[in-house]
Amino acid sequence: MDTIQKRYGYTGQGLRVNLTTGKITKEPTFPRFKDEIGGTALGYRVFWDEVPPKTQPLDEANKIVIAPGPFSGSGALCSSRTSITTIYPTIYPMPMIASAHIGGDMAARLKQAGYDFIIIEGKSEKPVYLYINNDNFELRDAKG
């Protein structure tokens, strides 16, 4: 394992969820995100690299990036934050990229499951939700 893989606070992998195909794949955190610290920076890097200019909130090219910071799950004070980066339709006067932040235990749970980020892309034909239990992950029907 080289030095870049030994970064503390990172699990070394994330998930990419394609709602169009239903495919979920693991992706390495490094070396791609070696210069980004925290969920917001990681989210903006994904948008810079992958989302075309002038993408609208409901376009299939838009993505949702869910990413906690490196201290999440460590017990450090104020570290249980998760960043959700996307092109939001509610930003005035026009839709634009932004990050919302949530607290609670989602950040720690995502790290405990072994993931630094989730990139959601595409569009599903029906309502689905992402089920994650450590190395088991799948899209499930949300209609019940």
Question: Which residues make up each language-model segment?
Answer:
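Acidic carboxylate diad motif detector
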Residues: M1-G144
